[in-house]
Amino acid sequence: EIQQNSNTTYRIYDYGRVGADGKPRQLHIDKAVDVTNLCPAKPYPQSEPVDMGGWTKKRLAKCEYFTVDVINVDTSAALEADKSSFVNILVLDGGCVLSSEGNDAVELKKGDSVFIPAGLGKFELTGKCSAVMTHID
């Protein structure tokens, strides 16, 4: 799930769970309806993959809050997490090694997700994998 940061949670269904007091937890249906946007989303035009030299990038979605790309790494991808945003990578298929200067390398496989903090700087994915890459704008 990709969303704007918020410290508010409205519970609209709770699967019959109960709180520490043994009673059903409070639902927030009216508040959830008040903040729900029921307008259909505008479809984002699909782009063609862009060859980045050793990997490709295809834009899935972009809005004022975040950008989502699918990347396909054939050999290696040199990337960067600058001070303006974290980068999140979710491996869809294959496997790769995430490395950055001064940090231990991390092996990633299908289903793994890694949060790369803002300001980490340059990092590299090496291997052969497909992944969803998200950052805020």
Task: Go through each PLM region and give its residues.
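Short, glycine-/Ser/Thr-/acidic-enriched flexible segments
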Residues: 7, 65, 76, 86, ...
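Glycine- and acidic-residue-biased ligand/ion/polar-headgroup-sensing regions
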Residues: 73-102, 111
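Short acidic-glycine-tyrosine-enriched beta hairpin
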Residues: 100-120
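Conserved hydrophobic/aromatic beta-strand scaffold that supports enzyme active sites
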Residues: 1, 47, 68-70, 88, ...
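C-terminal amphipathic alpha-helical segment
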Residues: 10-83
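Well-ordered beta-strand positions
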Residues: 72, 90, 107, 115, ...
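Ligand-binding loop in jelly-roll beta-barrel domains
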Residues: 1-8, 105, 118-137
